[in-house]
């Protein structure tokens, strides 16, 4: 699943470490999410969207939608 996590995080001036702490995950998890190596659980996706005050669809792009 593609995402705009890195773009949104950087636009808000937040480090990977700060985001990881807020989400209660490791910095490595944030990096893996940003690089598309890891798809978040639905709970983590909601936490990310809530943290940035955006919809899940603004962060995560379902590849099936692009077809």
Locations of regions flagged by a protein language model:
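Short, charged recognition helix plus adjacent turn
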Residues: 11, 58-67
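Hydrophobic micro-packing sites on short alpha-helices
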Residues: 45-49, 59-60
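Short alpha-helical DNA-recognition segment
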Residues: 14-31
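A short, Lys/Arg-rich alpha-helix, primarily the initiator
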Residues: 1-11
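Alpha-helical residues within the helix-turn-helix
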Residues: 10, 21, 50
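Short, basic-rich loop-to-helix N-cap that marks the start of a DNA-contacting helix
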Residues: 37-47, 65-66
